[in-house]
């Protein structure tokens, strides 16, 4: 199979879909890999490293996109939709519930789109987990930075000092992002509260952190109280493939103290805070509303691309090899985890939460893939 790795064009997205090591694994299995010139530079990988691994360095992005399977990091931007075609296998993060125009374009062009974030093995999301770990850890340190007065914050040191109270961190969502945010916040010495719907998960968090955190069951009263007290609010809710629910209302934000900070990690699925009304970028990461600093960057791990790219390649390559070795149709038929990642195929929306949120008919993956001639690698 011919596999294309284009350069990411999202604002300050310095990750790349494959390391040279990942390329070598695909090539050793008999596949061709086309890497766009400079695709790995942001992550510290020179063109020569990819060439040494056996990749072909291509200057023209169209030629890269003409590959049978394209591997990316972030969702394609509108200027990349022109490359969509029937038979293309696209393997990347998509977050389609928050990207209706992208979903429509993929559907219209008959692209076989497999989303990293919905590939699932049991109750785990193996291709989302490493980036969730990165984003969670970053959320605490970014929040700490923006609490500094020169960054617009109230001038709070999360750790406090002897004789001065510690900063209060509220984390909504006790999954991978929330747990990693808590690890960092606890490590910084903050006063940490975690809110989650699942009482069993809260028990697990109590076992992990003990007396270092407080836990609360998720309901509007507990959320309102914890948000009002927070110096830093970290939003870490995930419903796989679906749009994030609004849990923090504008009225709750108004009750926060001036200079408090919100980091909404769920923004790539629409966000859970009513006042987080647009995505921000690494160039302009924050805005102020009701006296509160809002951080809503959708590609947080792109700021630490070396770590993120290596972590991502570690988990995506085994699945990419299955697609490349077997062809997309057989790989999807054989592997239920990979099949759960299928979001569009042959003009159909094949992930139920995306179909529901965007108002499309849901077509099960098995039915959508019956016409094998519509899928690359068949």
Swiss-Prot record:
Main function: Catalyzes the reversible oxidative deamination of L-alanine to pyruvate. Oxidative deamination proceeds through a sequential, ordered ternary-binary mechanism, where NAD(+) binds first followed by L-alanine; the products are released in the order ammonia, pyruvate and NADH. Disruption blocks sporulation probably in stage V; 20-30% sporulation can be restored if the media is supplemented with pyruvate, suggesting lack of pyruvate blocks sporulation. Thus it is a key factor in the assimilation of L-alanine as an energy source via the tricarboxylic acid cycle during sporulation.
Residues that, per the record, bind NAD(+): 132, 176-177, 196, 218, 237-238, 265-268, 297-300
EC numbers for this chain: 1.4.1.1
Binding site for substrate: 15, 74
NCBIfam families membership: alaDH
Induction: A monocistronic operon. Induced by L-alanine in minimal media. Constitutively expressed in rich medium, declines during sporulation. Induced early during sporulation on minimal medium by L-alanine. Affects its own expression. Transcription activated by AdeR.
Record-level Gene Ontology MF annotations: alanine dehydrogenase activity; nucleotide binding
InterPro entries: Ala_DH (IPR008141), Ala_DH/PNT_CS2 (IPR008143), AlaDH/PNT_CS1 (IPR008142), AlaDH/PNT_N (IPR007886), AlaDH/PNT_NAD(H)-bd (IPR007698), NAD(P)-bd_dom_sf (IPR036291)
Name recorded for this polypeptide: Alanine dehydrogenase
A Pfam match: AlaDh_PNT_C
Disruption phenotype annotation: Strain cannot grow on L-alanine as a sole carbon source. Disruption of ald causes a sporulation defect, most likely in stage V.
Pathway: Amino-acid degradation; L-alanine degradation via dehydrogenase pathway; NH(3) and pyruvate from L-alanine: step 1/1
Species assigned in the record: Bacillus subtilis (strain 168)
Oxidoreductase among keywords: yes
Keyword Nucleotide-binding: yes
Catalytic reaction(s) noted: L-alanine + NAD(+) + H2O = pyruvate + NH4(+) + NADH + H(+)
Main location group: cytoplasm
Disulfide pairings: none
Source superkingdom: Bacteria
């Amino acid at each position: 199979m011919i596999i294309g790795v284009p350069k990411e064009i999202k604002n300050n997205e310095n990750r790349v879909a494959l390391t040279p090591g990942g390329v070598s694994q695909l090539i050793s299995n008999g596949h061709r890999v086309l890497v766009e010139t400079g695709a790995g530079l942001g992550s510290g990988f020179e063109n020569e490293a990819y060439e040494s691994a056996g990749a072909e360095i291509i200057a023209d992005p169209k030629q890269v996109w003409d590959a049978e399977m394209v591997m990316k990091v972030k969702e394609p931007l509108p200027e990349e939709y022109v490359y969509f075609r029937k038979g293309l296998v696209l393997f990347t993060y998509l977050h389609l519930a928050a990207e209706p125009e992208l979903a429509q374009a993929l559907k219209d062009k008959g692209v076989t789109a497999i989303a990293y974030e919905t590939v699932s093995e049991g109750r785990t999301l193996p291709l989302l987990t490493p980036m969730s770990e990165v984003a969670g850890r970053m959320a605490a340190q970014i929040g700490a930075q923006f609490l500094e007065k020169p960054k617009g914050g109230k001038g709070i040191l999360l750790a406090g000092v002897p004789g001065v109270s510690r900063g209060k961190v509220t984390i909504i969502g006790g999954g991978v992002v929330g747990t990693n945010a808590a690890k960092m916040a606890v490590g910084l010495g903050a006063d940490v509260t975690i809110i989650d719907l699942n009482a069993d998960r809260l028990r697990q968090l109590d076992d992990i952190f003990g007396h270092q955190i407080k836990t609360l069951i998720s309901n509007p009263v507990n959320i309102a109280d914890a948000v009002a007290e927070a110096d830093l609010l970290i939003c870490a809710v995930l419903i796989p493939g679906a749009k994030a629910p609004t849990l923090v209302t504008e009225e709750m934000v108004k009750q926060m103290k001036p200079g408090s900070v919100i980091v909404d990690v769920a923004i790539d699925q629409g966000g859970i805070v009513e006042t987080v009304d647009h995505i921000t970028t690494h160039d302009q990461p924050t805005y102020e509303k009701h006296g509160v600093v809002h951080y809503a960057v959708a590609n947080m791990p792109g700021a630490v691309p070396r770590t993120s790219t290596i972590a991502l390649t570690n988990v995506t390559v085994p699945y990419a090899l299955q697609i490349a070795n077997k062809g997309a149709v057989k790989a999807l038929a054989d592997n239920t985890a990979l099949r759960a990642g299928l979001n569009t195929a042959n003009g159909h929306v094949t992930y139920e939460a995306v179909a529901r949120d965007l108002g499309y008919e849901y077509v099960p993956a098995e039915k959508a893939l019956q016409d094998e001639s519509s899928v690359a690698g068949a």
